[in-house]
Curated annotation (Swiss-Prot):
Any GO MF annotation of the entry: rRNA binding
Pfam families for this protein: Ribosomal_L9_C (PF03948), Ribosomal_L9_N (PF01281)
Entry keyword Transferase: no
A GO biological-process term: translation
Protein name, per record: Large ribosomal subunit protein bL9
Endpoints of the signal sequence: none
An example Gene Ontology CC term for this record: ribosome
Gene that this polypeptide is encoded by: rplI
Annotated keywords: Ribonucleoprotein, Ribosomal protein, RNA-binding, rRNA-binding
Organism from which the protein derives: Nitrosomonas eutropha (strain DSM 101675 / C91 / Nm57)
Family stated for the protein in its record: Belongs to the bacterial ribosomal protein bL9 family.
Task performed by this protein: Binds to the 23S rRNA.
Top-level taxonomy: Bacteria, Pseudomonadati, Pseudomonadota, Betaproteobacteria, Nitrosomonadales
């Protein structure tokens, strides 16, 4: 199925690209999410008239993500979890815990935006985590996991 992309999609194309995708991907994801429209002659002509407006909207979103990345980059957050004597956590620190902590600090971050290269954190220590704010913008934060020992 041919679709016209309304925004840049990683590994697929950029704004205004006409690409062939599987029908299910178009019907179930791209079109409902507002990321693409079916590529008919009428839609293509309509898109060309709105291209400048859509490009400006995408640039504004990118600028906002860049501004938020500047605030986030290098940020240190501390999370306390119960841990044993050897520093091993009872449970783990997940992307949901990190997103919750960032929301407490007035950042609009969802758990799906957080990438943890080392997987879930199961030991006390400092870890670098990536926050993906946009396809092209990400920030690196440091998560310091503190152990609360129980007696």
């Amino acid at each position: 199925m041919q679709v016209i992309l309304l925004e840049k999609i990683v590994k697929l194309g950029s704004l205004g690209s006409i690409v062939n995708v599987k029908p299910g991907y178009a019907r179930n994801y791209l079109i409902p999410q507002g990321k693409a429209k079916r590529a008919t002659e009428r839609v293509i002509a309509e898109f060309e008239t709105q291209r400048a407006e859509l490009e400006k909207k995408q640039a504004d979103i990118l600028d906002a993500a860049g501004a938020q990345a500047a605030k986030l980059d290098g940020l240190l957050i501390q999370i306390s979890q119960k841990a044993g004597v050897d520093g091993k956590l009872f449970g783990s620190v997940t992307s949901a815990n990190i997103a919750e902590e960032l929301c407490k600090q007035d950042f609009a971050i969802e758990k799906s935006m957080i990438r943890m290269p080392e997987g879930q954190i199961k030991q006390v220590g400092d870890y670098t985590v990536i926050v993906v704010l946009h396809n092209e913008v990400s920030a690196h934060i440091t998560v310091s996991v503190l152990g609360e020992t129980t007696n």
